Amino acid sequence: MNSKHPPGTADAPPGATLYAMRRDPISFFMGLARDYGDMVRFRLGDHPHDLFFVSHPDSVRDVLVTQDRSFSKWFSVERIREVLGDGLFVSEGEIHLRQRRLAQPFFHRERIASYAEQMSALAIRLRERWQDGAVVDICREMNWLAMMIVGSTLFGTNVEIDAAEIRDALSEILDQFERSILPQADREDFAKALGRLDTAVYRIIQERRATGEDRGDLLSMLLLAQDEDDGGRMSDLQVRDEAMTIFLAGHETSANALSWCWYLLAQHPEVEVRFHAEVDEALKGRAPRMDDTPRLPLTGRIFAEALRLYPPLWVVGRRALEDIEIGGYPIAKGSVVIISSYVTQHDARWFPEPERFDPERWTAEARAARPKFSYFPFSAGSRACLGEAFAGMEGVLCLAALAQKWRLRVVPGHPIALQPQLTLRARHGIKMTLAARADSPPVA
């Protein structure tokens, strides 16, 4: 083990480092990797310990998988707990394991297959309400679609009545995650948005609890789950925390990924032509099904490449619970290790011309030639996103269903900028013009 510290900016004024990170966090972390290499040491504001930024796939594996028991989560816990309570995203240790075991069956392949029909039906419903020549913010459209899918599949509930309220409240809440210290006015806005979100979620919980109905979905499981020690049921607050976590993770990440897919396809018409040809040949005008996914390989590669370029879960932090070693350097107990899928997935060593959109990076041969942890848009290890397979199928089916009738073009002059919050959003949305496809087969 190297007894020395890794290179970095630890001697720079901590306030200057904090300012640089807040101003443009993606450029900040990309700059650390570019200027100092695979492991960087820095200080941040008045944080009492060193922080380390690691970007090499081997170190990513060590932090997320091989040495994950030596770390706890690190983030603005207080703010996230205000929104998600003690749900799966925030909890640690045995509580986290129990919550994960409780939810896991609803993300097994067999269960996910049963959601395919609802995913396709909702995508078709969206495409039928679109109008030729209309301008839409594709981020809002994909947000609605992903929200309806999570509500229908995991919660057995039509959330359309609350969709706009939930979307706007979540946007306000996520905006506040960009700041670590909120002025009072912002905190008041945050509290109001959280209140609106709670009202919608509690309404869904109370309506289902009143019926006592077991629909075999995730919400029923949460309401009927019994404590291993005393046999008691979850309180509305406990159900709310779990439901809020899964609802946020289940729709926010998918909505962002789908939005970036449409943007990338519009920028690369040569890929779009091949994409439309694949969809037309595989589906011949009918609704996409689960068993169509093997016949839509390019569609899957497009989704994977969008997740590489714009990973929704773009950064994670871990706090060392003991003295350990990562990348050949000592990490003291209490230190924080930060990993960014965005940075690693834009590393030219693993992805030549990393800014270029190239779905062919996802052929079996290309994947086998790269380190496993050069790509981790859903994190990895014991805290990997449970919904990875759910999101993958949702992405393929929704892209295919919408592309059967439409092609989309970015409105000229519309600004495209990243907004790195808890997830990676488009700061100004993505305004796109809908164009009905004249070359598609008749759609059933």
Language-model features: locations:
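N-terminal membrane-proximal hinge/A-helix region immediately C-terminal to the signal-anchor transmembrane segment
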Residues: 1-94, 98, 113, 117-125, ...
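Cytochrome P450 heme-thiolate monooxygenase catalytic core
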Residues: 1-9, 72-83, 91, 95, ...
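Cytochrome P450 I-helix active-site segment
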Residues: 6-16, 116-120, 168-172, 187, ...
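Proline-centered turn/helix-capping motifs that create local helix->coil transitions or kinks
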Residues: 158-159, 204-216, 270, 310-315, ...
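Cytochrome P450 catalytic-core helices
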Residues: 253-278, 389-404
